[in-house]
């Protein structure tokens, strides 16, 4: 399964909207970093490989801190973690073992190009090797039901999130008053 992060949306040339992570990527990994890609392999030896943006002091000065490979390793505990710049060269070997690639093509993120190339290579080698992925499948076939039906741990996490949201909304309401700028209310929330 290949799960790319949601794309960053721009308000104008160099002004971004607040980033909203991809729901499926966040649900399975907790990753909220733009441009991240998770590779999940199931089977006898399940593997979680994560690709994230490398640290870049110049870019971070303007757009905020990046997780980087080292922090992503400790924060998300993947089996492997690499710079997203290595995705093209590493993705094919990651996808070689299965018979299907789960990938949602709705992202205009460039990852689809690498997934398609890996699928084509596997199809070309298939007659010689007898293996490799043969089909592209929407991950919603698996994830939609998983996200819909909650276990006790997920229900407790939702209760906690609701309590935090209520407290934030109340704090925002308490900060309201004449002449209070919107950013003050947002900070209270």
What are the functions of these language-model segments?
Residues 161, 168-171, 175, 188:
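Generic, well-ordered alpha-helical scaffold segments in large soluble proteins
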Residues 1-168:
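A composition/biophysics-driven feature that prefers long, compositionally simple stretches
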